[in-house]
């Protein structure tokens, strides 16, 4: 038998095996809290924590919540919503603060309705549907983001601009070693969580950093980026500063971006490449570019 999650086919045997692994890991590592994560349509991370004794039931029935209280999820008349943990995303959380005296873990959730149908508004389910649509055309994709953010001394609430943590510039190393140490700590934590990193460096603006994640399939990368944002902000807090991914927190400094490299394959063949084309671009690549331009305004709405 197979589950009917859009965008992927997972055997029930495989799902049960993953659940058993999670339950065993929780017992062996004395994990006290499991955080179940999902996002609203604006990309804000949501979380509910469950005790280990409740997790097996959560796998079976999910966690019910009021979807009408989550941005964009449902109307009051459709408030009953269920967060279904995805055991394949299980990861032990790092202890980043001295107050962290217990071990916790996290899993991402798929949001479903009481009848078991995927929520139309859950960003993870929307992505699953698009991955399935791509697969139906014979394609699969890989995503590689370059994520930029500012480290600032504080985010003022009195209308004054934030103060960058350093005066460094592009690829600078000697910025009191504060930025390099921060990036080193962040990369260590990310890789301990199973999120591989390719590059990191100081960006153009004072206090601006960039960390590039290694490519992955779209769903894995979406989960990784949400984990990345959380970890970066927690490490910043630990170091007495704050991190912001706001596109333009400074009027007179460069913006934060997330340059995203997209690879598209048909089997083992690069679907974007045509050696006979003047620019070595296939018709698929040209159509892909046209689609991005057509939908650019909608894509930029949430950033």
Predicted regions and their residues:
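Glycine-rich, acidic/polar active-site loops that bind/position phosphate-bearing ligands
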Residues: 2-301
């Amino acid at each position: 038998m197979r589950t009917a999650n859009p965008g992927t086919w997972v055997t029930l045997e495989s799902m049960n095996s993953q659940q058993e692994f999670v339950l065993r890991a929780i017992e062996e590592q004395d994990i006290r809290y499991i955080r179940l994560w999902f996002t609203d349509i604006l990309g804000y991370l949501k979380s509910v924590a469950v005790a280990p004794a409740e997790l097996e039931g959560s796998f079976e029935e999910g966690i019910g919540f009021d979807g009408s209280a989550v941005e964009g999820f449902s109307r009051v008349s459709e408030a009953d919503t269920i967060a279904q943990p995805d055991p394949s995303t299980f990861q032990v959380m790092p202890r980043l603060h001295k107050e962290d005296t217990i071990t916790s873990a996290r899993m991402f959730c798929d949001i479903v309705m009481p009848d078991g149908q995927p929520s139309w508004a859950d960003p993870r389910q929307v992505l699953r549907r698009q991955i399935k649509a791509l697969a139906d055309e014979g394609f699969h994709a890989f995503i590689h983001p370059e994520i930029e953010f500012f480290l600032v001394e504080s985010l003022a609430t009195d209308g004054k601009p934030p103060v960058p943590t350093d005066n460094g510039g592009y690829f600078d190393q000697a910025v009191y070693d504060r930025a390099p140490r921060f990036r080193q700590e962040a990369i260590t934590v990310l890789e301990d969580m199973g999120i591989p990193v390719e590059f990191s460096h100081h960006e153009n603006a004072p206090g601006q950093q960039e960390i590039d994640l290694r490519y992955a399939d779209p769903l894995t990368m979406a989960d990784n980026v949400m984990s990345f944002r959380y970890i970066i902000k927690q490490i910043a807090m630990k170091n007495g500063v704050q991190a912001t991914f706001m596109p333009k927190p400074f009027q007179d400094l460069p913006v934060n971006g997330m340059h995203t490299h997209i690879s598209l394959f048909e089997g083992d063949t690069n679907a974007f490449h045509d050696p006979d084309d003047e620019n070595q671009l296939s018709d698929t690549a040209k159509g892909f570019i046209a689609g991005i331009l057509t939908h650019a305004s909608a894509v930029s709405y949430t950033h």
